[in-house]
């Protein structure tokens, strides 16, 4: 009898435990609530300011531990709205969040502790927020098939050009025409006037998601993530006016573990700007820009794959010092399977149609800065370009371990009027220490590299369209180098009467193998003060009028260069 009672007691206890367990699971699995903004007073009529109603809907979800804030079809005008943990905005088809035209509807940023530029205090437009901000939030998302529109036209003087004057026109080619090109309006940038700050901000957040939505007409940066850990952006479209300055697509600063996939970005300023971040992976995106499609600064362990770009400057990589912060190089970054089309354009945009651009700030006098860019690799890049690629280290801060593998540079003729006004200049702004060095007159090789150690050029092809402007010059030029490898190169110079397929100056340690001179090559290899000439073998130089200039230059291992081809 006691045994039966014990068994009954045990069975009851087991049933009680199961009830408790399933009750917990059921409670845990209850979905977060959905808070329809219209239920909290939002009109969605395109006229009424719905900031308060939207904020109340968010607050109602927050009280229940989080939830979905739902926007049905309509045009909801808002100023600044704050998002919190476990809040998910859902914009249904036909729903538009539209930025207020009244600048007073946007909150100041200092109370949030947020400053747009690298943690440095800012004033003016940088001291205002935009439409949405999340601070110290976890698990926050914006999803749906609707649109967030920043109403940029309300904050622009469309008949005034924006010229930052970060150059000295005395040192550019054709100064008068260059200056006139800075004031034209067709390509922008146009002048902003009293605009709000970044449209969407995630500041010190984690587990951020953007999916499906359309972001349009940002008057300033579009999406800014700062100190974010874990972000997934997928299947979104950003469509901004290409004339508006600073309307970057997505900016990541001091972020980790970011994924950006299957998205289209159309911006005036940088498409993607990644600064002091780590483990950023971008794939299967289309980017257009009047500035750089991708801008990278002091970022490491990141990949960019399967991209197409239609832009002024293609891929821009910088290694910089930030005031008061420990220098951190850009390193261990790979760009693969990318198609780039660059355009030379007038206006105050940074860039001169470079498909690939790497630069570091010069060191102060008598100071060795150390490596600022290293182990940056480009694989399978096809570029149709109106300007040359630049790889520019600095004295005391050489680029180290940069590789170009399977890269084709097809150089094409820019618009003649634009070429005459702004072509034939190197654009060194951002890394230049003075306006004197910002934009400078120069001939333009298809690929120019300076102050580089361990540069590897494998299967690089250079070809030129007929009738290139006379400022275009060599196929490849490398200056101030150590340990250079050129393998399986094919190319020639731009002009029939001057330049070389390869021009090497002031370096030590070079091997050239398996390479080919293209028809029309004047001089295949031109050398000036190059030491430790190691290997020059396995080539097809039948199309070169001259193989090596000057004739006295020889390699340690050199096979079959006819004397008649030394000049």
What are these regions (language model features)?
Residues 28-567:
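Extracellular/periplasmic carbohydrate-active domains that bind, remodel
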Residues 14-27:
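Bacterial N-terminal signal peptides
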Residues 7-10, 22-23, 375:
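Intrinsic disorder/low-complexity segments in short proteins, especially the signal peptide
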Residues 2-3, 7-14:
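Positively charged n-region of N-terminal signal peptides that target proteins for export
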